[in-house]
Amino acid sequence: MELGLSLGDAVTVADGGRLELVLGLGVGVGAGVRRGEEEERGRREDVVGAGRWAAMAAASPEPSVRLSLVSSLGLHWPSETGRSEAAARGFDVNRAPSVAAGAPGMEDDEEGPGAAPALSSSPNDSGGSFPLDLSGQGLRGHAEAAAQGGGGGGGGERSSSRASDDDEGASARKKLRLSKEQSAFLEESFKEHSTLNPKQKVALAKQLNLRPRQVEVWFQNRRARTKLKQTEVDCEYLKRCCETLTEENRRLHKELAELRALKTARPFYMHLPATTLSMCPSCERVASNPATASTSAPAAATSPAAAPTAAARTAVASPEPHRPSSFAALFAAPLGFPLTAAQPRPPPPASNCL
């Protein structure tokens, strides 16, 4: 015996008179049928199967056993034009099943289009089929339906949020517009009092024809602007101080580096040993005779007329003893020219030594 596996094909007789058993696996996917129609269809299949087995038993000498695994549920396969294509490509879950009659022998027994099984099932029907759609179109349809349902809810939420945003934008656009007189009066009031108590707030609002809340908000904004400006001024001042300190610190670091370099460098001069002061002989004479040097200076400063007189007096007062000699006797005769006074001796030159 030969076993052939096929999906949805009818039972065929192989060459040589042998029976080719066909394993029919039917999966009903889609809408179910009612219980009564299923029972009637099952009875018809049993009758047709019995007739076929009798014919095959008469034609075949060997005993044959029929294995039928066809479910009692309705087999909804494509029509005759698409039967060969379905048999060739097998079971396609992406293709929507048809609602026509499934059995090839039962097409003639159908009573007409009005006798098509109703696409409904009851929860109490134990033999009814369950609706299950695995096709891509069905999945896409469910996804689109869910998206439309969610989009409807989300659209409502978006519309409500957009409406609230519009309301907020309208309230934001409705800013307080003050006239020049009102602004000037509020500025003067702020200079006098940066904060207001409730009584002052009500009085000022009544005077300016405003609400107390508007006056309070204006004062809050004015205090915030004043604080911001003061903060900016302080920030600029601190920035300048920081820059000055940075420059001073850089200068001090530079001086410190120079001092360290001088400390570690080798000195350019050698320390000379201690020595004694030496004086030249002329300086020593000047230092030993201070009185002589002091008296000789006024004598040199006198007039030239008084100098011969003083020299003559000195020569007369202290005459030196004269010892005659043979050579002097030869020239004992008096000289014919008068004796002149001795020229004063110039003072010694000053010494250059220290």
Swiss-Prot record:
For region Leucine-zipper, the annotated ranges are 229-273
User: Where is it found, in Gene Ontology cellular component terms?
Assistant: nucleus
**Subcellular localization, per the record?**
Nucleus
Q: What InterPro entries does the record tag this protein with?
A: HD, HD-ZIP_Homeobox_LZ_Class_II, Homeobox_CS, Homeodomain-like_sf, Leu_zip_homeo
PROSITE patterns (alphabetical): HOMEOBOX_1, HOMEOBOX_2
Region feature (Disordered): 98-175, 294-323
Q: Which UniProt keywords apply?
A: DNA-binding, Homeobox, Nucleus, Transcription, Transcription regulation
Q: Does the keyword Transcription regulation apply?
A: yes
- Superkingdom in the source lineage: Eukaryota
Q: Which GO terms describe its molecular function?
A: DNA-binding transcription factor activity, RNA polymerase II-specific; sequence-specific DNA binding
Q: Where is the composition biased (Gly residues)?
A: 148-157
Has the keyword Electron transport been applied to this entry? no
Pfam family membership, one: HALZ
Q: Just give the chief location class.
A: nucleus
Q: Which residues bind DNA?
A: 171-230
Family stated for the protein in its record = Belongs to the HD-ZIP homeobox family. Class II subfamily.
Q: What does this protein do?
A: Probable transcription factor.
PANTHER family in the record, alphabetically? HOMEOBOX-LEUCINE ZIPPER PROTEIN HAT14, HOMEOBOX-LEUCINE ZIPPER PROTEIN HOX27
Q: What is this protein called?
A: Homeobox-leucine zipper protein HOX27
Task: Name the encoding gene, please.
Answer: HOX27
